[in-house]
């Protein structure tokens, strides 16, 4: 295990430079600042009391580091969420016009980028927490230089939630609408709000743990997505497919660990000794409960769906025909399998038909040429 001095040296070497925050904020504002400011102005004009209340609440609750962290304007955050939801609706409505995209190159870059970013954030938070002298749980969001380093990583983790919205865009462009579920949209929007709140009120302390664990899970998740895109078929893809539900279970375990953290802080630690915001810990606990319920439901449904597909593949009953008459499902030697009929049953029916035709031909005294013709006709059905 690293000593505090060793951790300090490594943390200082990999620290996010302050100029990254200012330069990235200036770049993003140059692209979207005008629209975001217009949204805030409309809120201020139409809802002056609510706007004033939020501004007063922020001044009273903001952590000292919050003034140094960009993209914490609540109205800009709300505008971002509305833009995200609007984009989902727009891409869903325009699917006929836009067509279907493969998005392979975009997906490779996106998943590899988030894989590397998650690795950096997970290791950075772990080492920086050690350098700051943190214990596992019950840590305060202080104002020391070591904790400013952690605050920047928490802010980077918060901003990465916006980058993850590209997951949804890629799914919609590929027309994988089944993946854009209520769970998917709920998770991507609410986690952004939760980490905006943590970055504003307490960017450090206990927030380091859930950000570190989540980033660690995302290292494997986005790495898995990247490799599956790199190998869309073959042995590697077959091996990776076996780990699909392991990723989901890993996500659920992180929710359990976060629940344990908040339970420890709120129940085990005496309230007068609690070093972090009790309100944020309560929000964390109930949010994790909601995600556990939704992810658990998702896991059960998808396991049942996969089980049905395996059963259908084994029995041959998975094939269907659509309204245009195109058949899809299991095929054997080019034979189209009808609904509810296995390949063996189909072969038996064909043999029975041939036998019946032979019997009729023998009865009527037909020749070998007609017999062969009828056999060929029966065999082609």
Please identify what each model-predicted range represents:
Residues 2-208, 213, 228, 232, ...:
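Membrane-helix and juxtamembrane interface regions of eukaryotic multi-pass membrane proteins
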Residues 216-222:
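Acidic, glycine-rich loop-and-strand cores that form catalytic or ligand-binding grooves
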